[in-house]
Each structure stands twice: as structure tokens, then as C-alpha cells.
Curated annotation (Swiss-Prot):
InterPro entries: DXP_reductoisomerase, DXP_reductoisomerase_C, DXP_reductoisomerase_N, DXPR_C, DXPR_C_sf, NAD(P)-bd_dom_sf
Cofactor: Mg(2+); Mn(2+)
Record's catalysed reaction(s): 2-C-methyl-D-erythritol 4-phosphate + NADP(+) = 1-deoxy-D-xylulose 5-phosphate + NADPH + H(+)
EC number: 1.1.1.267
Positions bound to Mn(2+): D148, E150, E219
Gene Ontology MF term list: 1-deoxy-D-xylulose-5-phosphate reductoisomerase activity; manganese ion binding; NADPH binding
Keyword annotations from UniProtKB, A to Z: Isoprene biosynthesis, Manganese, Metal-binding, NADP, Oxidoreductase
Upper taxonomic lineage: Bacteria, Pseudomonadati, Thermodesulfobacteriota, Desulfuromonadia, Geobacterales
The name this protein goes by in its record: 1-deoxy-D-xylulose 5-phosphate reductoisomerase
Amino acid sequence: MKNLTILGSTGSIGVSTLDVVAAYPDMFRVVALTAGNNLELLKTQIETFRPELVSVLTAEKAQALSRSLTGKKPEIMHGVEGMIAAATASETTMVVAAIVGAAGLVPTTAAIMAGKDVALANKETLVTAGHLVMQMVREKKVKLYPVDSEHCAVFQSMAGHRSQDIARVILTASGGPFLNWGREQLQGATVADALNHPNWSMGRKITVDSATMMNKGLEVIEARWLFDIPVQRIAVNIHPQSIIHSMVEYVDGSVMAQLGTPDMKGPIAYALTYPGRVPSGVKALDLTALSGLTFFKPDTDRFPALKLAYRAADAGESMPAVMNAANEIAVEAFLAGRIGFMAIAEAIEKVMDLHEPHALASIEEVLETDRWGRRTAKEVLGVGC
């Protein structure tokens, strides 16, 4: 039996993870949960899965949660201290890292340093601190299983093959809700437009990232660290049907791909049960029911965020962390109605132009760089600190 901590249990990935866990009570036990603002859902999760420890954002939320619970209560903590306690709980054997954004970095690295295997859905951990995180993974001899559908597909497509035989990795992207929109249309895109993803059901921030194609840019950087492959050998193909989740091309011209119905429970179940497989509740793929599979190159003129991510990856050092911080602030401003859709990438580029990349030797240096990126993005956007 695997004892799980789920960081971000009330988010999209956290909820899907608990759906998988509920289907296999003999395989999984929930030790700890962390959540942000959705106390009502967290209360339901506590009553269903009976964790020993839960953590929320603030002391006030912890008190409110405690008052709402009846009967035997779990230990309730809050803040970064609570997230770290959940990530490093002694009984936990695997941590599902599903917190959105750079906020997931500290508890995820704490889990690794405590010797926990990690099912990684928080791509920002590797985007901001990839070299440090992978060094920790090697030192602690833990397993890092990708939960992103694209990286899970690459992981499966590499199975049984030698790394020296890999020519390149090809990440697929749906193109998001604005696949066929022109630049003029994009200038007037609303929050509701951006959140209307054609294939995937995700949280608000990642759905906007998908609309700008920054999500794919973050995944390029994540793949660079996960699979130890130069970013120049990681390509992106637009694939509107989201059936092929990613591909690996080998030196002999062969291409291995992983296909499936778009449903995050598939990669989650794979990460939780590797090297085995279990029925995940994902609808079986019927290729005969498809009218066709199409692929084409991304348009970085309409979607400059992808180009910015490649620029950050090429610059290396602190630049990806700055880019990510600027993106989080810009997306937050867009969702709040303070800036337009195209202003997201414009703000990120301005912040990157102001930054001189430097080496990052510790997680604290990564966090300081993240803080600089956020402050600078707020100044660029004029949204205050």
C-alpha cells in the first residue's frame, strides 16, 4: 500500500488524484492533504479519506476548518510550515505535488529531501529550479514521476530505449481556445474566452497558460530537466485533437507516441501505480471514431509566450524563474480584468529584458529571484505591490 500526501488536494489535479485513490482503497491511504481556499471541498475530502494531517493557507482558515469539523479531527496546520509538514510526514511514501505555480517549489523539494517519491504535477518546480531539484533527486535516490500528460507520454515512449538513441522529444499542444483567432481578435479576448478550453478541464491559471501557449513553454523547460535533453532537441507540434499526448523520435527515424482520450486520471493513475497499470476510469480510445489527427507548427507571432519560454531556456540560470514569476503576476492581472490578453506576453518580455541572468546555487536564491520577478512584473503592469 502507498501512503500519500497530496499537495493541492482541492485543485483540478488533486481532485482527480483522489478519484483514482477512491477507486483503489486497498492500494492507497491518504496521510495528509493541503489546500488553498476551498475549505468546503477540503472538509468533504477529510470526511471521506480521513487524513492524519491537513494544512491550509492561513491561521484563520485553519480555525474555520477546525470549527466546521465534527468527530475526530486531523491535525490542522497552516502556511509554508504546514505544507512542509505534510510533504515530509513520516508515514508518507509518495507525495503528489499538485500545487499551482512557484508556491509548490518549497514543499516539493522538502519532500524530495525527506526521501519521498514524488508524482510531479507542479511544472514550475523544475522550471524555476530544475538543476537543483534534479541534483536532489539523484542525491536522495528518489523517483520523480511526471503527471503532466505530455511528460507522462514522453516517459512511456522512452521506456525500454537507450537515452543515446533519442533524436528529439516532440511535445503536442492543443492550441487552446484561440487556435484559429487572429491577432486583432486576440487583442479583445476576454477571460471567459480564455477559460473555454476545447479539450481539457483544468484550473483557471493553467487554462490561461494554455491559451497563451506559455503552458507549453513551461513544459519544454520541464522536459529539459526531467529527461536530461537539450532544449534545442525539444519541439512543439500543434495537435488540436489532443489524442497523441507527445512523441519521442529516435536516431533511426522511428517515432514512439502515447495516445489516449484526454483525461488527467490516466497519467495520474500511471504515476501512482508505476510500473503497473490499473483501470483508471478513462474512456477507451476508439481510433475508428476519429475523423483524423492533424499536426502543424505553432505560430509564435500570435502566441509569443512560447518563444519567450525558449528564450528563457536558452539563457538558463535565473531567467526561467523570472519568466515564470512574471507570467504568474500577468495571468493574475488578466484574470482580475486589469490587463488584456496580449498584454500577458508583453509584460513577461519587458521583465525578461530588465533581467540579467545569474547562477542560482540554492532554493533560497531561487525564491529571491522569484520575488524580484514578481515585484518587477507588478511595476511593469502598474498593478501595485
